């Protein structure tokens, strides 16, 4: 069983809200505990969060809002999640830095990859906020881009309500089966929607592995980081 030295953890915005609009403190506290366990195990970790518990640009666009403006609103929602997670991590004694793609000098550092790497080398958690800082990019793609630029060994995609990648939506199709292993080419060819296809393609081109797993039970993040085989491992093949 082999572990990782530096990981990028992708968390959905819906997870922060516990299925509702806003931030659920109990959920964020649980996630912070899990991340603290990873840090205490000596693993370097960076995090990208979504903002779907506040805004989704594509959905607001369908209701008539300008997509660019809606996406920027989503980026601000992501920063709120970052600050909430930072607060709970620091209450646990974990040094944390938030870096944002849009300058917000009073609450976060600007996104500087070399500084992010240095923070992780010092044992700090780095939380990347405000997406890519540009509209039309999903946080899935941002997670992969940040992982590549900060030289992470793997992208860990933590999911709520599903424990890996399936042939179809297991909540809708009782015949759906879970993949233990998968290649990016297969994921793209099958049209699997666990992450967007741009993220899959970017990982595949750069041979960056991804593990898709469920957040439950508590402790799964540490298990994955330490090399335990849970969820689905996606590789370039």
Curated annotation (Swiss-Prot):
Record-linked InterPro entries: AceGlu_kinase-like_sf, Asp/Glu/Uridylate_kinase, Uridylate_kinase, Uridylate_kinase_bac
Positions annotated to bind ATP: 10-13, 52, 56, 160, 166, 169
Gene3D superfamilies per UniProt: Acetylglutamate kinase-like
Signal sequence segment: none
Binding annotation for UMP: 51, 71, 132-139
Pathway involvement of the protein, from the record: Pyrimidine metabolism; CTP biosynthesis via de novo pathway; UDP from UMP (UMPK route): step 1/1
Keyword Protease attributed: no
Modes of activity regulation: Inhibited by UTP.
Pfam families: AA_kinase (PF00696)
Keyword Nucleotide-binding applies: yes
CC terms in the record's Gene Ontology section: cytoplasm
SUPFAM superfamilies, sorted: Carbamate kinase-like
Compartments, as annotated in UniProt: Cytoplasm
Superkingdom of the source species: Bacteria
HAMAP family: PyrH_B (MF_01220_B)
Family: Belongs to the UMP kinase family.
Function per UniProt: Catalyzes the reversible phosphorylation of UMP to UDP.
Entry protein name: Uridylate kinase
């Amino acid at each position: 069983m082999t572990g990782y030295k530096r990981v990028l953890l992708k968390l959905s915005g819906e997870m922060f809200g516990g299925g509702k609009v806003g931030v659920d403190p109990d959920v964020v506290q649980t996630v912070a505990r899990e991340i603290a366990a990873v840090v205490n195990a000596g693993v370097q970790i960076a995090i990208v969060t979504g903002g779907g518990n506040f805004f989704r640009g594509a959905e607001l666009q369908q209701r008539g809002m300008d997509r660019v403006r809606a996406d920027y609103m989503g980026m601000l929602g992501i920063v709120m999640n970052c600050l909430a997670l930072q607060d709970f991590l620091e209450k646990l004694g974990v040094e944390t830095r938030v870096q944002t793609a849009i300058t917000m000098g009073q609450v976060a550092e600007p996104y500087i990859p070399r500084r992010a790497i240095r923070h992780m080398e010092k044992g700090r958690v780095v939380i990347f906020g405000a997406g890519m800082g540009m509209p039309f990019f999903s946080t899935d793609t941002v997670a992969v881009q940040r992982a590549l630029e900060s030289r992470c060994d793997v992208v860990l995609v933590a999911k709520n309500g599903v424990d890996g990648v399936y042939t179809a939506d297991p909540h809708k199709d009782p015949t759906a089966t879970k993949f233990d292993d998968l290649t990016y080419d297969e994921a793209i060819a099958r049209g699997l929607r666990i992450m967007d296809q741009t993220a899959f393609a970017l990982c595949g081109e750069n041979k960056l592995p991804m593990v898709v797993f469920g957040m439950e039970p508590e402790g799964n993040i540490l298990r994955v980081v330490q090399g335990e085989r849970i969820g689905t491992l996606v590789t370039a093949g």
